[in-house]
Amino acid sequence: MNRTTDRVDVVVAGAGMAGATLSCALAAAGLDVSVIESGPAPQWNGENYDLRVSAINLASQNILMALGVWPTIRQKRISPFDDIETWDEGSTGRIFFSAADAGLRHLGHIIENKAITATLHEKLKQQKHAEMHYGLSVTQCQSNDEEIVVTTHKGRVFRARLLVGADGALSRVRELAGIGLHQRPYRHAAIVGHVVTEKSHRQAAYQRFLSSGPLAFLPLADQRSSIVWSADTNLAEELLQLPNDEFQCRLGNAFQHRLGHITSVSHRERFALVHRHVERYVSHRIVLVGDAAHTVHPLAGLGANQGLVDAATLAEVLIDSANRERDFGGQVTLRRYERWRRGENQLVLNTLDGLYHLFGSGHPMIANIRGLGLNMTDRIAPLKMMFLRRATGLSGDLPQMAKHSRS
């Protein structure tokens, strides 16, 4: 890789899950990639639990296997989940998904975000076609028919065929590209933390739809669970400020003590929930992936998986174009990626919006309808299997990396 002129094939701004996944795939295919990350390199020591976790589905697992990082991630702290149980506070509705019913070993894995990103960064540092630049932020970009010139806040300049914005929900690349954004707050915030429960979670994920918002318990190692409690902003702030013993009591009651008493609770954090989707995924020699393009409500745990599939899809499109000796930073190539992913991501956003409003209503008639819907889905095997395939990520038009396990 030419390290004197900083002339590369692709510049990736942002090295979170989506950006690092894309960079690994491109570098493995022989494209020279410069990765610009505003923060420090992610560190994993295994001592403290990361409050941010992801429910990695089977499609995302396949992507991580294809990159050769899954075995290393497995050596860190991960927890498979074999069952998903969902029930509704306002009705008798309940649905239960089991890996065994679908002939699968697991439905997915709960993994701390730092365990994934740290492993991907370790992989990138081993790639001869990848170069990491920490503590840099993109401040300017200017494109022509041949290339895009990217300037950072420290004056470092990169010349490339393509700039990828993987720099999160507040994307600077998106702003520089002039790409419009549709966004609206959910008027909810999520409280995240870890708890230890009296009873074992039995490798199951649980979600209860409360009138105030969904509450999820996601299995971690031992009898520890990650919690994501979404509530209106006032209630979320109240929950955040409660002493631990009062919070444990409120949480246990909200969860109907499904796993017995909550014996301890970690430090908690709160973050706002916002629906975002860009008007377009591409500009002139610029393309967006992951949270830079879309953010969703966490009630289905799909955000990280969407970003990983974005990355795998864009990698497939770019590598195919490069192999055909076409302009992989040109509009024809980039529009192919946009057509592939925009509709799928919009479907997820619309579905989650619908669920958010459906389960957020306290109207008795709507509560009865959703209870009937949950129970009906639980009893109709083909319908239940359709939802299960959706949950595992194995439906829809997937890139090759997401389709097949390569263990």
What residue ranges belong to the model's regions?
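Conserved N-terminal helical subregion
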Residues: T5-R7, P71, R77-L176, Q183-A189
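N-terminal Rossmann-like FAD-binding beta1-loop-alpha1 element of flavoenzymes
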Residues: D9-V35
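Glycine-rich FAD pyrophosphate-binding loop
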Residues: A27-Y49
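N-terminal glycine-rich dinucleotide-binding loop that anchors FAD/FMN and/or NAD(P) in oxidoreductases
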Residues: D50-R74
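Conserved FAD-binding catalytic core of PHBH/FMO-like flavoproteins
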Residues: L64, E147-V149, V157, L162-R268, ...
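FAD/FMN-dependent oxidoreductases across multiple families
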Residues: E237-V332
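C-terminal helical "tail/cap" subdomain of flavin- and related membrane-associated enzymes
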Residues: E316-S407
